[in-house]
């Protein structure tokens, strides 16, 4: 069985950059690595992603949002994640179920029991072996996110960046509470530090977890 590692954090925390760096390092170490993301990761889930993140869809209700995430996740897990793990690969996933709890639970205020049920249904009980939480102040993350959006011609994936600072603070608080509740699964990394310092901290933690077998 492979190893399932997820990355979480507020907008602009640096997840995507760090996943690429870790994938390169693990590949050089001889691991077969799959890099994926949520929402998305496969054609059907990518179509849901386009709807979820399009800034033109601000009329979307929280419940619609939750159900679209669950549908995309169910397809992604069965089509991509589980087959890769069965093939003894390391799967690095940019967001997973914790994002739904943080964003739709803490951020939107949806019922935790409903979210837990849908997460369990969509994942068929699959849980990450390790979750890397890149934590940084909301203001720092949002500035990075908007710099990225403004630098990308025709960027449309900005619906969550347009939410209030208060919303993003609730999301961050949610992530930190999740990490507090499951310290054996989470590691918290300071996402406001430099890329190299962050990479070193993540690499050390991941290699230690892989060495556990």
Curated annotation (Swiss-Prot):
EC number: 2.7.4.9
Leading EC class: transferase
Reaction catalysis annotation: dTMP + ATP = dTDP + ADP
Domain of life: Bacteria
Residues noted as binding ATP in the record, renumbered to the chain: 9-16
CC annotations in GO: cytosol
Gene3D superfamilies according to UniProt: P-loop containing nucleotide triphosphate hydrolases
Molecular-function GO term, any one: ATP binding
Keyword presence, ATP-binding: yes
Keywords annotated in UniProt: ATP-binding, Kinase, Nucleotide biosynthesis, Nucleotide-binding, Transferase
One GO-annotated biological process of the protein: dTDP biosynthetic process
Family, as annotated: Belongs to the thymidylate kinase family.
Name of the protein: Thymidylate kinase
């Amino acid at each position: 069985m492979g190893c399932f590692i997820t990355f979480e954090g507020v907008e602009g925390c640096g997840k995507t950059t760090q996943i690429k760096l870790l994938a390169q390092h693990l590949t050089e170490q001889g691991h077969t690595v799959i890099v994926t993301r949520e929402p998305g990761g496969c054609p059907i889930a990518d179509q849901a992603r386009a709807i979820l993140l399009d800034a033109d869809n601000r009329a979307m209700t929280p419940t619609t949002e939750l159900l679209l995430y669950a549908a995309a996740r169910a397809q992604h897990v069965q089509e991509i994640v589980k087959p890769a793990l069965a093939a003894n690969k390391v799967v690095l996933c940019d967001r997973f179920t914790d994002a739904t709890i943080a964003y739709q639970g803490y951020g939107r205020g949806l019922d935790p029991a409903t979210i837990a049920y849908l997460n369990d249904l969509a994942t068929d009980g699959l849980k990450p072996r390790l979750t890397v939480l890149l934590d940084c102040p909301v203001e720092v993350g949002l500035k990075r996110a908007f710099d990225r959006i403004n630098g990308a011609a025709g960027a449309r994936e900005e619906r969550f960046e347009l939410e209030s600072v208060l919303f993003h603070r609730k999301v961050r608080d949610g992530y930190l509470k999740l990490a507090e509740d499951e310290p054996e699964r989470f590691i918290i990394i300071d996402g406001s530090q430099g890329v190299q310092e962050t990479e070193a901290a993540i690499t050390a933690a991941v290699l230690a977890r892989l060495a556990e077998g």
